[in-house]
Structure formats: structure tokens, C-alpha cells
């Protein structure tokens, strides 16, 4: 079974207790999603999860006074906590979360990409984890990062997957997807882990660069010419 598959069951159907992603009568004990294997996610019917988590491996080098190390992200839940695999608490810059190590998070607005302090459900973002030899080691984030939310009493709302997940900018759209999309000439993908074309990895959106993975976002023109630089 795909690691990001959600299974809906009635209470009279028994499955091993160690299984995740099982929804009984509208409630899931634990939902575990991952970027590994680039498997899709789809929620056909809303439910509540007592705990939900998504794991992503960040490896890129970020810039120092220049754009680099960016990638995109979209998640199906409002993120409450971000944790590095070594236990460090992470949070977007200016979040004012005590003892958290900061990372960059930006949403697309009519004015362009702007810094934000929360990662909300079904909203496309660009994201970068500080990772550069010039930074203090305590601020470098390299490896697996878990985005999670938890509510054992009322549950975390997981809504039906929208038909479209878009934010509109001054001349282009940023669209999130939970499915893989084949590369084509109408969409621009960020050059994650790709130093070719004369640009540093994670610095530009390039047309037809590669396939889109689930939980990623892509740029498309909005009636005007699209510039590739973040």
C-alpha cells in the first residue's frame, strides 16, 4: 500500500494496531505522510486526525546574501510544530516561538513572495532551511524534518482535497499538488538539487525542468510573462 494512502473503515473491520492512516468512523489515530518515494495523497472525505505528520528530507545549501536552497511545499493540515530529526524545534523567522531555530517560509501575494509565520492547510509556499558552512552549526538544518499537528480531544481537521490549490501573484500563479505531474512546457519548477543552467540549486523556477512531486508547487503564467527568479 502506498505510504500516503488513507483507508476508511467501519469499526467492525479489524486491522493491526501498528497500521497508520486508518480512518474509523471519521476519526484517525495517526496519519503519517512522507515525501519519500514521491507517492500521492488524496482525501476524498473529510475526517479528524488525533495526530498527523509529514516528513521531508532537506539537503540543499542555502545562500549567503543570495537566493539558493529554496524549495516548495503544500500540506493538507495546519502545521502546529516543526521538528528536526535531532529534536530541535524549528519555526519560521519572526514566529516568536521560544528556543526555536528559524527557517524561511514565504507565501505568494499580489505583491510577490512575502514572509509568513505559519504553514496552513492547502496553501502553497516556498521554504528554505538554513544550511551553509558560514552559519553557526546550531542554526543549520540538514536532514529529515517533521511537520505535525496533534489534538487528542477534538482532532485535527483534514478536509477533502481541493480541486485547485492556488495563490495568485503579480504575474503568475503558484499551484500546489498532492499528485505527481509530468514535466511540460506550461509549468515552471524550482531547480531543487539542480545547479545546471547557470543557477544555484533552489534559486529559480525553470520551465519544463522536471516532473512535479506530490506535496510540491509549481509556477504558471497568469496572462503575463513569467520571470524565473524568486
Please state what every model-predicted region is.
Residues 96-98, 195:
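Polar low-complexity intrinsically disordered regions
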Residues 99-114:
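Short linear interaction motifs
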Residues 12-88, 110-230:
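A short, polar beta-strand/turn micro-motif
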Residues 1-12:
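Structural signature of tandem-repeat unit edges
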Residues 91-95:
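Intrinsically disordered, low-complexity transcriptional regulatory regions
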Amino acid at each position: 500500500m502506498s505510504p500516503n494512502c488513507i483507508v476508511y473503515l467501519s469499526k467492525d473491520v479489524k486491522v493491526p494496531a501498528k497500521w497508520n492512516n486508518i480512518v474509523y468512523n471519521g476519526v484517525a489515530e495517526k496519519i503519517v505522510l512522507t515525501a519519500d518515494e514521491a507517492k500521492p495523497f488524496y482525501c476524498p472525505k473529510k475526517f479528524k486526525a488525533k495526530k498527523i505528520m509529514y516528513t521531508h528530507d532537506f539537503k540543499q545549501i542555502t545562500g549567503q546574501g543570495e537566493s539558493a536552497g529554496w524549495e516548495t511545499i503544500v500540506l493538507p493540515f495546519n502545521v502546529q510544530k516543526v521538528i528536526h530529526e535531532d529534536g530541535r524545534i524549528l519555526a519560521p523567522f519572526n514566529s516568536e516561538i521560544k528556543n526555536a531555530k528559524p527557517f524561511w517560509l514565504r507565501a505568494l501575494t499580489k505583491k510577490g513572495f512575502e514572509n509568513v509565520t505559519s504553514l496552513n492547510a492547502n496553501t502553497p509556499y516556498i521554504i528554505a532551511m538554513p544550511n551553509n558552512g558560514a552559519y553557526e552549526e546550531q542554526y543549520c538544518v540538514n536532514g529529515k524534518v517533521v511537520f505535525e499537528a496533534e489534538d487528542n480531544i477534538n482532532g485535527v481537521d483534514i478536509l477533502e482535497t481541493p480541486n485547485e490549490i492556488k495563490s495568485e501573484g503579480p504575474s503568475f500563479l503558484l499551484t500546489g499538488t498532492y499528485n505527481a505531474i509530468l514535466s511540460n512546457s506550461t509549468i515552471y519548477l524550482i531547480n531543487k538539487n539542480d545547479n545546471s543552467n547557470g543557477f544555484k540549486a533552489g534559486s529559480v523556477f525553470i520551465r519544463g525542468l522536471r516532473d512535479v512531486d506530490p506535496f510540491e508547487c509549481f509556477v504558471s503564467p497568469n496572462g503575463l510573462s513569467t520571470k524565473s527568479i524568486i
